[in-house]
Every structure is written in C-alpha cells, then in structure tokens.
Amino acid sequence: MRQILIAVAIAVAVSILLTPVLIRLFTRQGFGHEIREDGPPSHHKKRGTPSMGGVAIVAGIWASYFGTHLVGVVIDGKGPSASGLLVLGLATALGAVGFLDDLIKIRRARNLGLNKTAKTVGILVAAVLFGVLALQFRNVDGLTPGSAELSYVREIATVTLAPAVFVLFCVVVVSAWSNAVNFTDGLDGLAAGAMAMVCAAYVLITFWQFRNACATSPGVGCYNVRDPLDLAIIAAATAGACIGFLWWNAAPAKIFMGDTGSLALGGIIAGLSVTSRTEMLAVVLGALFVAEVTSVVVQILAFRTTGRRVFRMAPFHHHFELVGWAETTVIIRFWLLTAIACGLGVALFYSEWLTTVGA
C-alpha cells in the first residue's frame, strides 16, 4: 500500500506542476487545437486551446513509476518488473503515435493529422510487439506478463489461444481501447476523469490479486498473475496523473490531452486488462469508453446501410449536447455512469472470489 500512495502522490505532483508549463510553452509556440467544423457551435470558442497535454500525463506516469521503484529499491530491493515495463512501453508507443498526429494537426491548422493508414500501422506495430513480448519473460513461477488463456476476472482454462491468435487478440484489444478513449476525449475533462476512475478500480483489483497471489498465498481463490503489485502501481500512477491533469483540463479547459494522451491512456487500459487477466471485465469497468466507440461504429454502419443517422452526431456525447444538454451536464452524468460501472466491475471481481473460496 505504501508504494501505491507514493505512486499517486508523485504522479499528481508531476502532472499538476508540468501541465501549466506546457500550457505556456504550447501557447507561445501556437500549438492550438483545431475544432471540427461540423461540431457543436459551443465548441468553436475552444479553437486555439493548447493541445498535446497528454505529454504531462505520460511524464507523470513514468516519473511516478520510477520514483516509486527508486524508493522500493532502497527499502526492499525490488525494482521494475517485466509486466510494468510492457504496459508502460505500450502506452508510450501509442502516445508517440498520438503525438505525431497532434503535431501534424497543429502544423497544418486543421483537425486531420496522420492519415488513417499511418495511424493504423503505428497502433498495429505497438500492439504486435506488446502481444509477442507479453508471452515472454517467464518468471521463477512459470508466469509470463500475458496469458494465452482468455480471461474474465481470472483465466478461463477452457479457452486457450494459440500464440499467433493471442497476438491477434492483443491487436484487437489495443486498437479497440486506444480508439475508445480517443473518441471519448471530446469534452473538457471527460476522458481524464473517467480514466482516473477506471484506474482506481484497477488499483483495487490488482492489489487484491497481489494479496492473494498463488506465488505467495497458494490456496483456493489465489491468482496466477505476474507482478500484480507493479500493475497496481501503474494504475495508481495513471489515476494520479489524470487527476493532476484534470486540474487544468476541467471545464473550461486550459489545455487538451490530445491524441498524445488519449491513445496512451487507451494503451494503459489494454495493457492492464491483458497483464491482470481481466480482458472481459475491462469492458464493464470501461463501459463509458465502450459506449462511445460503439456509438461511432453504429453511426457509420447505419449511415452506410440506410443513409440515416442514429445520433445527431457521434461520438454520442456530442449528441446530448446537440439535444440541449450543457457540456458540464454531459460530463458530470457520464462521470456518474463511469463510477457506477467501475463499482459494478469491482463488485463482480470480488463476488467471483467469494464464490471461488466458498464464502
């Protein structure tokens, strides 16, 4: 628990202090956000707001992770783990793709950055590398960061994927989550606030896995997860970095995270879900992100097949704006729904453990 508290404190401090520095720097450089011409009229006033604030989030996560482990090495000699570095590597690689996308948008002064092919290739490369490496680095207990067995709240022994299929599965998971968070980042503070809640839920889940790990506490209901405490540290660091960033990103936002932040945060969810063996449970925890990306898919399919739109605008947070909800109303209500989803997800996780141990 000490490491988790340290991780949150460092991440909040770095993010909340670095973000205003980036605001001033990006404002001087003219790194302003471009607004969709077909977007809600109320968003046009946001044109020129500094973007790429995700740099502060990623920096906060890295500083927190290594700062926490620096303290850990001094106290108990434990350093970074393969699982932790894989998740951070995935998030950073996706953040780099997002950074290039943001930079091109700014340089060209339009809301279109990397072309679809380049962006897809970047995400694909990061996902494939993650999938391949997730089945390496076997520890003394025979555990790798990822598992070829599909998982809900723990591995489902009856559903085992071949290595190549597992890598393909990782590509789907990474692509889905990175796009889901990216689509959600359309209102001031919405994605950052929701992400903080999802990561807080993951802190509880991974810390419980650590306390009931088969390697240290064998018995009924134990978890075969490699490096669960390190995953809890990453989840705590991400939650802290999002909270620090939210101080400046809350409505009216002084800076946006951009694709730099949204793609990186999507990578965090994808990485945590795979390494903690909770790929299916993550859909419940991140229900808001799932709903947002689903609204886009539904809108596209409906328009291509019928020529009609289901929503006035997708992602569907814009639909609610266009029907008369104030932006802050949409944000707060979506945060409430996220809190409910996270509570439900944690309850499902814990109830499965109670059922397993026969409590």
Swiss-Prot record:
Entry keyword set: Cell cycle, Cell division, Cell membrane, Cell shape, Cell wall biogenesis/degradation, Magnesium, Membrane, Metal-binding, Peptidoglycan synthesis, Transferase, Transmembrane, Transmembrane helix
Taxonomic superkingdom: Bacteria
Protein name: Phospho-N-acetylmuramoyl-pentapeptide-transferase
NCBIfam families: mraY (TIGR00445)
E.C. code: 2.7.8.13
Location in or out of the cell: Cell membrane
Gene Ontology cellular component list: plasma membrane
Bilayer disposition of the protein: Multi-pass membrane protein
Cofactor: Mg(2+)
Family in the record: Belongs to the glycosyltransferase 4 family. MraY subfamily.
Function (record text): Catalyzes the initial step of the lipid cycle reactions in the biosynthesis of the cell wall peptidoglycan: transfers peptidoglycan precursor phospho-MurNAc-pentapeptide from UDP-MurNAc-pentapeptide onto the lipid carrier undecaprenyl phosphate, yielding undecaprenyl-pyrophosphoryl-MurNAc-pentapeptide, known as lipid I.
Reactions performed catalytically: UDP-N-acetyl-alpha-D-muramoyl-L-alanyl-gamma-D-glutamyl-meso-2,6-diaminopimeloyl-D-alanyl-D-alanine + di-trans,octa-cis-undecaprenyl phosphate = di-trans,octa-cis-undecaprenyl diphospho-N-acetyl-alpha-D-muramoyl-L-alanyl-D-glutamyl-meso-2,6-diaminopimeloyl-D-alanyl-D-alanine + UMP
Major subcellular location class: membrane
GO molecular function: metal ion binding; phospho-N-acetylmuramoyl-pentapeptide-transferase activity; UDP-N-acetylmuramoyl-L-alanyl-D-glutamyl-meso-2,6-diaminopimelyl-D-alanyl-D-alanine:undecaprenyl-phosphate transferase activity
TM annotation in the entry: 3-23, 55-75, 84-104, 117-137, 156-176, 190-210, 231-251, 255-275, 283-303, 330-350
Organism: Mycolicibacterium vanbaalenii (strain DSM 7251 / JCM 13017 / BCRC 16820 / KCTC 9966 / NRRL B-24157 / PYR-1)
UniProt pathway: Cell wall biogenesis; peptidoglycan biosynthesis
InterPro entries: Glycosyl_transferase_4, PNAcMuramoyl-5peptid_Trfase, PNAcMuramoyl-5peptid_Trfase_CS
Gene Ontology terms describing biological process: cell division; cell wall organization; peptidoglycan biosynthetic process; regulation of cell shape
